[in-house]
Amino acid sequence: MFFKFLNYFSKSNLLVLILLASSVVNADWFALNMTRGSTDISNEVFELHMLIFWICVAIGVVVFSVMFYSMWAHTKKKNPIPAKFHENHKLEIAWTIIPFLILIAMAVPASKTLVKIYDDEAGDINIQVTGYQWKWQYRYLEDDVSFFSNLSTDLDEIYNLVPKGENYLQEVDEMVVIPAGKKVRFLITANDVIHSWWLPAFAIKQDAIPGFVNTAWTVVDKPGIYRGKCTELCGKNHGFMPIVVKVVEQAEYDDWVYSKKQEAIKLAELTTKEWTAAELVERGESIYEVNCVACHQTSGQGITGIFPALAGSDIVMK
């Protein structure tokens, strides 16, 4: 009976198995697997993942080998009279002790890595990360620098009017900038609903929960640009909340902090400036495109029942 079933299975599913096998062979290995990170911790997480993966593969090979051998060797045709026995104490002890030792082998390195991940004390730089629908706010606590980071992908790309760029939906108008080789601590929270701040290259994924602060940290030695995203469904534009971190040398970081402080001074001066009507329109348009268009739409019509229309609104007209 078993071989009849196997024969039927082989004929009906051979093509599917061949297609699946060919897709796996031709696929990039790292497209199907966890990728290496850019920090010591993220590389430890990768090595831990691969260790447990190969342990699971070995267990699977042993278990399925025994199972298929038993199905082949102990058929009714070969053994018309079944063996009768109740227990085997040596075997029971073996299959209790061996899994216990395997779990210990996985738990020890995992615990060591977890201890390092949660050692978030005494950061050289502390950055408060606040999730909003649908953007991030970053505040550098020591330097009194604060800004919002919004998706900057062109709307024409989103609506398929032009070809999509290399970093489609992974571009922002303001990047997080941190210095290389310094311990940076992130204090992660939210203003409205639950978000999740995820940077795979740093092995960081922390929920941003209103009223709570979760912490994470990193030390990145290699300058470059690293990208992540919100990974907690947070509403209509959940997919439009990218995270971009730029790692630079200390001197460049100091220059960036200075420039942000100068921007804050200029912004404060604008509060006392006398604006012309044309300047107000231009300024309002730029602010609307950054902060309002995601909810109230380019036309100002909003979304019925969710975000009210601004076009023709008495509040706007007044």
Give the ranges of each region predicted by the language model.
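Alpha-helical transmembrane segments
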Residues: G60-H74
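Non-transmembrane, membrane-proximal soluble domains of secreted or membrane proteins
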Residues: A27-L51, M71-R283
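Active-site-proximal cofactor/substrate-binding loop regions of enzyme domains
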Residues: C56
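N-terminal secretory/membrane targeting signals
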Residues: M1-D28
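Sequence/structural segment immediately N-terminal to covalent heme-attachment motifs in c-type
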Residues: A277-I303, G312-K318
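Cys/His/Pro-rich metal-binding microdomains
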Residues: T231, V293, P308
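Gly/Gly-Pro-rich "capping" loops immediately C-terminal to redox-active cysteine motifs
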Residues: V219, P242-E249, G302-K318
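Hydrophobic alpha-helical membrane-embedded or membrane-associated segments
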Residues: K11, L15, L51, G60-F64, ...
